[in-house]
Swiss-Prot record:
Its EC number is 2.1.1.255. One of its GO terms (molecular function) is S-adenosyl-L-methionine binding. It catalyses: (2E)-geranyl diphosphate + S-adenosyl-L-methionine = (E)-2-methylgeranyl diphosphate + S-adenosyl-L-homocysteine + H(+). GO terms for biological process: methylation; terpene metabolic process. The keyword Magnesium applies. This is Geranyl diphosphate 2-C-methyltransferase. Catalyzes the SAM-dependent methylation of geranyl diphosphate (GPP) to yield (E)-2-methylgeranyl diphosphate (2-MeGPP). Signal peptide: none annotated. Keywords: Magnesium, Methyltransferase, S-adenosyl-L-methionine, Transferase. Belongs to the geranyl diphosphate 2-C-methyltransferase family. Its cofactor is Mg(2+).
Length: 292
Protein backbone atom coordinates (compact mmCIF):
# COMPACT_ATOMS: atom_id res chain seq x y z
CA UNK A 1 0.00 0.00 0.00
CA UNK A 2 1.29 3.46 -0.89
CA UNK A 3 0.21 7.04 -0.62
CA UNK A 4 1.09 9.54 -3.31
CA UNK A 5 2.62 12.95 -2.58
CA UNK A 6 3.39 15.68 -5.07
CA UNK A 7 6.43 17.95 -4.81
CA UNK A 8 7.64 20.81 -6.97
CA UNK A 9 9.85 18.45 -8.93
CA UNK A 10 8.24 15.03 -8.88
CA UNK A 11 5.43 12.83 -7.73
CA UNK A 12 6.65 10.17 -5.30
CA UNK A 13 4.91 7.10 -3.99
CA UNK A 14 5.60 6.85 -0.29
CA UNK A 15 4.91 3.69 1.74
CA UNK A 16 1.94 4.01 4.07
CA UNK A 17 2.16 2.76 7.69
CA UNK A 18 3.23 -0.86 7.43
CA UNK A 19 1.54 -2.20 10.58
CA UNK A 20 -1.53 -1.51 12.72
CA UNK A 21 0.82 -0.10 15.38
CA UNK A 22 2.25 2.42 12.92
CA UNK A 23 -1.30 3.41 12.02
CA UNK A 24 -1.99 3.97 15.72
CA UNK A 25 1.09 6.17 16.05
CA UNK A 26 0.17 8.16 12.94
CA UNK A 27 -3.31 8.71 14.35
CA UNK A 28 -1.87 9.69 17.76
CA UNK A 29 0.35 12.41 16.30
CA UNK A 30 -2.20 13.55 13.71
CA UNK A 31 -4.57 14.31 16.59
CA UNK A 32 -1.92 15.75 18.94
CA UNK A 33 -2.24 19.47 19.62
CA UNK A 34 -0.78 19.92 23.09
CA UNK A 35 -0.29 23.54 24.15
CA UNK A 36 3.15 22.57 25.49
CA UNK A 37 4.31 22.00 21.91
CA UNK A 38 2.42 24.77 20.15
CA UNK A 39 2.78 27.62 22.65
CA UNK A 40 6.49 27.04 23.05
CA UNK A 41 6.92 27.08 19.29
CA UNK A 42 5.02 30.34 19.05
CA UNK A 43 7.90 32.02 20.90
CA UNK A 44 10.06 32.19 17.76
CA UNK A 45 8.45 29.94 15.16
CA UNK A 46 10.56 26.84 15.86
CA UNK A 47 8.18 24.02 16.78
CA UNK A 48 9.90 21.20 18.65
CA UNK A 49 8.80 17.75 19.79
CA UNK A 50 11.58 17.07 22.24
CA UNK A 51 12.65 18.16 25.71
CA UNK A 52 15.19 20.65 26.97
CA UNK A 53 18.64 20.65 28.55
CA UNK A 54 20.71 23.10 30.53
CA UNK A 55 20.42 25.26 33.63
CA UNK A 56 17.31 27.37 34.06
CA UNK A 57 17.97 31.11 33.84
CA UNK A 58 16.29 32.20 37.06
CA UNK A 59 17.22 35.83 36.49
CA UNK A 60 15.29 35.81 33.21
CA UNK A 61 12.23 34.35 34.95
CA UNK A 62 12.11 37.01 37.64
CA UNK A 63 9.41 37.23 40.29
CA UNK A 64 6.86 34.35 40.22
CA UNK A 65 4.18 36.84 41.27
CA UNK A 66 4.77 39.06 38.24
CA UNK A 67 1.98 39.12 35.65
CA UNK A 68 4.45 38.15 32.90
CA UNK A 69 5.99 35.24 34.81
CA UNK A 70 4.13 32.46 32.97
CA UNK A 71 5.08 33.97 29.62
CA UNK A 72 8.71 33.99 30.75
CA UNK A 73 8.47 30.33 31.84
CA UNK A 74 7.22 29.38 28.38
CA UNK A 75 10.07 31.29 26.74
CA UNK A 76 12.60 29.63 29.04
CA UNK A 77 11.28 26.13 28.37
CA UNK A 78 11.52 26.83 24.65
CA UNK A 79 15.08 28.12 25.02
CA UNK A 80 16.07 24.87 26.74
CA UNK A 81 14.45 22.79 23.98
CA UNK A 82 16.35 24.72 21.30
CA UNK A 83 19.54 24.27 23.33
CA UNK A 84 18.95 20.52 23.18
CA UNK A 85 18.66 20.63 19.37
CA UNK A 86 21.83 22.73 19.13
CA UNK A 87 23.67 20.19 21.29
CA UNK A 88 22.57 17.39 18.96
CA UNK A 89 23.80 19.37 15.94
CA UNK A 90 27.14 19.98 17.65
CA UNK A 91 27.70 16.24 17.13
CA UNK A 92 26.58 15.95 13.48
CA UNK A 93 30.07 16.55 12.12
CA UNK A 94 30.92 18.53 9.01
CA UNK A 95 28.13 19.33 6.56
CA UNK A 96 27.59 21.98 3.92
CA UNK A 97 25.27 23.19 1.16
CA UNK A 98 25.97 20.17 -1.05
CA UNK A 99 25.02 17.66 1.66
CA UNK A 100 21.73 16.01 2.54
CA UNK A 101 20.69 15.52 6.16
CA UNK A 102 17.81 13.37 7.41
CA UNK A 103 15.65 13.96 10.49
CA UNK A 104 13.95 10.62 11.19
CA UNK A 105 10.79 11.35 13.15
CA UNK A 106 10.86 15.06 12.36
CA UNK A 107 7.77 16.27 14.23
CA UNK A 108 6.74 19.77 13.18
CA UNK A 109 10.19 20.47 11.78
CA UNK A 110 11.85 22.86 14.24
CA UNK A 111 15.17 21.01 14.25
CA UNK A 112 15.17 20.82 10.46
CA UNK A 113 14.96 24.60 10.21
CA UNK A 114 17.80 24.93 12.73
CA UNK A 115 19.95 22.42 10.82
CA UNK A 116 19.48 24.23 7.52
CA UNK A 117 20.32 27.58 9.09
CA UNK A 118 23.44 26.12 10.66
CA UNK A 119 24.84 24.00 7.81
CA UNK A 120 23.12 25.33 4.69
CA UNK A 121 22.32 21.72 3.79
CA UNK A 122 19.24 20.17 2.29
CA UNK A 123 17.25 18.65 5.15
CA UNK A 124 14.74 15.85 4.61
CA UNK A 125 12.33 14.94 7.40
CA UNK A 126 10.20 11.83 7.70
CA UNK A 127 7.18 11.28 9.93
CA UNK A 128 4.18 8.97 10.01
CA UNK A 129 1.95 11.97 10.69
CA UNK A 130 0.48 13.82 7.72
CA UNK A 131 -0.52 16.65 10.07
CA UNK A 132 3.07 17.09 11.22
CA UNK A 133 4.44 16.96 7.67
CA UNK A 134 1.92 19.54 6.47
CA UNK A 135 2.76 21.81 9.40
CA UNK A 136 6.50 21.53 8.79
CA UNK A 137 6.18 22.17 5.07
CA UNK A 138 3.95 25.18 5.68
CA UNK A 139 6.56 26.67 8.03
CA UNK A 140 9.30 26.01 5.46
CA UNK A 141 7.28 27.90 2.84
CA UNK A 142 6.66 30.78 5.25
CA UNK A 143 10.40 30.97 5.91
CA UNK A 144 11.15 30.64 2.17
CA UNK A 145 13.39 27.65 2.68
CA UNK A 146 11.07 25.02 1.19
CA UNK A 147 13.60 24.44 -1.60
CA UNK A 148 15.96 23.07 1.07
CA UNK A 149 13.74 21.81 3.90
CA UNK A 150 11.02 19.21 3.31
CA UNK A 151 8.92 16.95 5.51
CA UNK A 152 7.22 13.90 4.08
CA UNK A 153 4.90 11.17 5.27
CA UNK A 154 7.16 8.17 5.37
CA UNK A 155 8.00 5.08 7.39
CA UNK A 156 11.47 5.75 8.84
CA UNK A 157 12.22 2.02 8.49
CA UNK A 158 11.67 2.15 4.72
CA UNK A 159 12.72 5.51 3.31
CA UNK A 160 13.08 6.57 -0.34
CA UNK A 161 16.65 7.84 0.06
CA UNK A 162 19.32 6.30 -2.14
CA UNK A 163 22.01 4.10 -0.65
CA UNK A 164 24.93 6.15 0.62
CA UNK A 165 23.28 9.46 -0.32
CA UNK A 166 23.06 11.05 3.14
CA UNK A 167 25.87 12.81 5.02
CA UNK A 168 24.30 12.81 8.48
CA UNK A 169 21.06 11.73 10.11
CA UNK A 170 19.43 11.77 13.49
CA UNK A 171 16.56 10.64 15.68
CA UNK A 172 15.54 13.11 18.36
CA UNK A 173 13.31 11.25 20.81
CA UNK A 174 11.70 9.09 18.12
CA UNK A 175 13.52 5.75 18.45
CA UNK A 176 11.08 4.39 21.03
CA UNK A 177 8.48 3.83 18.32
CA UNK A 178 10.47 1.30 16.29
CA UNK A 179 12.63 -1.81 16.43
CA UNK A 180 16.20 -0.59 16.83
CA UNK A 181 17.79 -3.17 14.53
CA UNK A 182 15.39 -2.26 11.73
CA UNK A 183 15.96 1.45 12.34
CA UNK A 184 19.75 1.33 12.37
CA UNK A 185 19.79 -0.94 9.34
CA UNK A 186 17.95 1.77 7.41
CA UNK A 187 20.21 4.58 8.63
CA UNK A 188 23.24 2.44 7.75
CA UNK A 189 21.83 1.91 4.25
CA UNK A 190 21.30 5.55 3.31
CA UNK A 191 24.30 7.04 5.17
CA UNK A 192 27.51 7.32 3.20
CA UNK A 193 30.58 5.57 4.59
CA UNK A 194 32.02 7.98 7.13
CA UNK A 195 28.60 9.57 7.63
CA UNK A 196 27.37 10.52 11.06
CA UNK A 197 24.36 9.30 13.04
CA UNK A 198 23.18 10.94 16.27
CA UNK A 199 20.33 10.18 18.61
CA UNK A 200 19.10 11.82 21.79
CA UNK A 201 16.72 9.55 23.61
CA UNK A 202 15.33 8.41 26.91
CA UNK A 203 16.30 4.84 27.77
CA UNK A 204 15.79 2.63 30.76
CA UNK A 205 18.88 1.83 32.80
CA UNK A 206 19.90 -1.87 32.76
CA UNK A 207 21.51 -1.37 36.16
CA UNK A 208 18.02 -0.81 37.57
CA UNK A 209 17.13 -4.37 36.52
CA UNK A 210 13.94 -3.87 34.52
CA UNK A 211 11.87 -0.89 33.36
CA UNK A 212 10.52 0.88 36.45
CA UNK A 213 6.89 1.78 37.07
CA UNK A 214 7.72 5.33 35.97
CA UNK A 215 9.10 4.10 32.64
CA UNK A 216 5.97 1.99 32.19
CA UNK A 217 3.85 5.11 32.75
CA UNK A 218 5.81 6.99 30.09
CA UNK A 219 5.35 4.09 27.65
CA UNK A 220 1.60 4.10 28.27
CA UNK A 221 1.31 7.88 27.97
CA UNK A 222 3.06 8.08 24.59
CA UNK A 223 2.06 4.61 23.29
CA UNK A 224 5.73 3.77 22.83
CA UNK A 225 8.30 1.16 23.86
CA UNK A 226 11.34 2.64 25.59
CA UNK A 227 14.51 0.61 24.96
CA UNK A 228 17.45 0.03 27.27
CA UNK A 229 20.76 1.79 26.77
CA UNK A 230 22.38 -1.60 26.12
CA UNK A 231 19.97 -2.30 23.24
CA UNK A 232 21.06 0.87 21.44
CA UNK A 233 24.74 -0.01 21.52
CA UNK A 234 24.13 -3.61 20.45
CA UNK A 235 21.87 -2.65 17.54
CA UNK A 236 24.30 0.00 16.32
CA UNK A 237 27.21 -2.44 16.37
CA UNK A 238 25.15 -4.94 14.38
CA UNK A 239 24.52 -2.34 11.67
CA UNK A 240 27.94 -0.81 11.01
CA UNK A 241 27.34 2.23 13.22
CA UNK A 242 30.28 2.69 15.58
CA UNK A 243 29.53 4.88 18.63
CA UNK A 244 32.31 7.32 19.50
CA UNK A 245 30.49 9.70 21.85
CA UNK A 246 28.01 8.90 24.62
CA UNK A 247 26.81 11.74 26.84
CA UNK A 248 24.57 11.22 29.86
CA UNK A 249 22.23 14.23 29.74
CA UNK A 250 20.07 13.11 32.66
CA UNK A 251 21.27 15.82 35.08
CA UNK A 252 21.01 18.38 32.28
CA UNK A 253 17.36 17.67 31.47
CA UNK A 254 16.06 17.44 35.04
CA UNK A 255 15.90 21.25 35.51
CA UNK A 256 13.73 21.48 32.38
CA UNK A 257 11.25 18.99 33.82
CA UNK A 258 11.21 20.60 37.24
CA UNK A 259 10.41 23.96 35.63
CA UNK A 260 7.81 22.49 33.29
CA UNK A 261 6.04 20.88 36.25
CA UNK A 262 5.39 24.37 37.66
CA UNK A 263 3.88 25.76 34.45
CA UNK A 264 0.33 25.90 33.14
CA UNK A 265 1.35 23.52 30.34
CA UNK A 266 1.60 20.33 32.39
CA UNK A 267 0.38 17.18 30.65
CA UNK A 268 0.35 14.83 33.64
CA UNK A 269 3.51 12.93 32.74
CA UNK A 270 5.98 15.30 34.39
CA UNK A 271 6.16 13.37 37.68
CA UNK A 272 7.09 10.12 35.89
CA UNK A 273 10.02 11.81 34.17
CA UNK A 274 11.23 13.59 37.29
CA UNK A 275 11.01 10.55 39.58
CA UNK A 276 12.58 8.15 37.07
CA UNK A 277 15.49 10.50 36.47
CA UNK A 278 15.99 10.94 40.18
CA UNK A 279 15.89 7.22 41.07
CA UNK A 280 18.21 6.27 38.20
CA UNK A 281 15.77 3.98 36.39
CA UNK A 282 15.58 6.26 33.35
CA UNK A 283 18.38 8.04 31.52
CA UNK A 284 18.53 10.76 28.90
CA UNK A 285 21.48 10.20 26.59
CA UNK A 286 23.12 11.35 23.39
CA UNK A 287 24.87 8.74 21.26
CA UNK A 288 26.88 9.73 18.18
CA UNK A 289 28.16 7.06 15.79
CA UNK A 290 29.97 6.88 12.47
CA UNK A 291 28.99 4.67 9.53
CA UNK A 292 31.83 2.27 8.69
Amino acid sequence: MTTETTTATATAKIPAPATPYQEDIARYWNNEARPVNLRLGDVDGLYHHHYGIGPVDRAALGDPEHSEYEKKVIAELHRLESAQAEFLMDHLGQAGPDDTLVDAGCGRGGSMVMAHRRFGSRVEGVTLSAAQADFGNRRARELRIDDHVRSRVCNMLDTPFDKGAVTASWNNESTMYVDLHDLFSEHSRFLKVGGRYVTITGCWNPRYGQPSKWVSQINAHFECNIHSRREYLRAMADNRLVPHTIVDLTPDTLPYWELRATSSLVTGIEKAFIESYRDGSFQYVLIAADRV
